[in-house]
């Protein structure tokens, strides 16, 4: 009887532990679905109603902030007596220009403004979660659009540098036998850019939730700081760096 009673106690303990784990996993799945779900903020009453999602509104906010900063930072510029603000801005712009020049090469300099704009947007989009907004990069539509824009620009850069015939001929280089692989690569590049950015941003949420389950205090706050700041900036760097390398490959 005593051994049977101990067995029942162990069974109940295992049952409660298992039930607790199931509840926690259900909460994780529910939180993940909330992160994937993009809410409709309002609807434009045209063509039967055009929904405007949260990621679009946050993108508009980012665009407005960047636009206002550009106006404020470009006021009262002077060649002879530059202010500290002007020196800081010029140093930052020169740094971006030098970095992207090394990445895309001399032939790809015309695409540096695009790469700079994308880097600034993705960086701010990944950091905007610190202000309570949902980062637009958690919406796969946003990351897919960024990837498609970049790939279209890469192919256009290749056509401009080599001409239409040279661009078509490049698919059969270095050997005609790898033509299918080169064609497939055109579709693989945007997919890899999209999934890398989306997966890393979403993966940070999953890791944070798992850490909260295991160590509910202190440690999650430290990792939250890392994922919200450093990982977001790293993903912006990786996206534009790969895009720059693809442009260099297409133009040389």
Annotate the PLM regions.
Residues 1-13:
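Single conserved hydrophobic/aromatic residue that forms the stacking wall/gate
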Residues 14-252:
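Selective transmembrane helix interface/packing segments
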């Amino acid at each position: 009887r005593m051994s049977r009673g101990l067995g029942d106690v162990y069974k109940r303990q295992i049952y409660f532990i298992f039930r607790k784990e199931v509840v926690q996993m259900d909460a994780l799945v529910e939180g993940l679905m909330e992160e994937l779900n993009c809410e409709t903020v309002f609807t434009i009453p045209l063509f039967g109603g055009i929904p405007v999602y949260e990621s679009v509104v946050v993108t508009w906010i980012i665009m407005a902030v960047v636009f206002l900063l550009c106006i404020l930072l470009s006021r009262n510029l002077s060649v002879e007596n530059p202010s500290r603000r002007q020196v800081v801005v010029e140093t930052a712009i020169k740094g971006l220009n030098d970095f992207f020049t090394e990445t895309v090469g001399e032939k790809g300099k015309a695409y540096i403004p695009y790469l700079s704009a994308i880097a600034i947007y993705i960086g701010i989009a990944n950091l905007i979660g610190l202000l309570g907004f949902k980062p637009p990069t958690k919406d796969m539509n946003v990351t897919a659009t960024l990837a498609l824009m970049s790939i279209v620009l890469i192919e256009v850069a290749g056509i401009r540098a080599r001409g239409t015939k040279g661009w078509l001929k490049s698919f059969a280089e270095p050997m005609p036998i790898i033509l299918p692989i080169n064609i497939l690569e055109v579709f693989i590049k945007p997919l890899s850019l999209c999934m890398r950015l989306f997966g890393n941003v979403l993966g940070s949420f999953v890791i944070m939730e798992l850490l909260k389950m295991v160590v509910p205090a202190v440690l999650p706050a430290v990792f939250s700081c890392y994922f919200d700041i450093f990982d977001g900036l790293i993903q912006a760097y990786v996206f534009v760096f790969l895009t720059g390398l693809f442009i260099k490959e297409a133009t040389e």
